[in-house]
């Protein structure tokens, strides 16, 4: 069991602070500014931003700060990603239920990017479970798939944030043109601040995931792990 390097917690702390700003912003925007309360229209941004983006970001950071065995980290990572996937699916369902139709919703770049990001996330979760949790896969297969799992996970996370940004722009454009929301009003400023917070959050989470300084295992631990799990060759 490796100890947590205090220097590694700096980016995690910044990620938590930016995530808190994002959560407060989307809650304030969805529940208080339109004066609609909790409804299907307000559930969509809440589930997609807090349930999908924030929870999946926390799942990525699990490997950077959580002390314990690799099995414990993988289990927490798996369950958090499963929660994020469930929130994303439910968030899409609320949009369909609110607009009364499936095909009527798929007309914009935001809708197509959302479908792509959730589909990739679901495929990533299933393949990750089969490769790293299910014991049927051989060690060499998991080792080969690991770089692709990391890359596709970060790509999908970035795509989800980009999708949220297009959704914010689409919604703000509608509010300003159809409902005469002031460009410098509180709602416009809140949406713009939410977009900046999401961009900052994505940058911090991805940086913490790819920088060697913030990886959870030391070099000596990796060498021991590699020597123990290296497949043996049978001589003929």
From Swiss-Prot:
EC number(s) per entry: 7.2.1.3
UniProt keywords, alphabetically: Electron transport, Heme, Iron, Membrane, Metal-binding, Translocase, Transmembrane, Transmembrane helix, Transport
UniProt remark on cofactor binding: Binds 2 heme b groups non-covalently.
InterPro entries linked to this entry: CYB561/CYBRD1-like, Cyt_b561/ferric_Rdtase_TM
Binding site for heme b 1: 44, 110
Primary enzyme class: translocase
Protein name: Probable transmembrane ascorbate ferrireductase 4
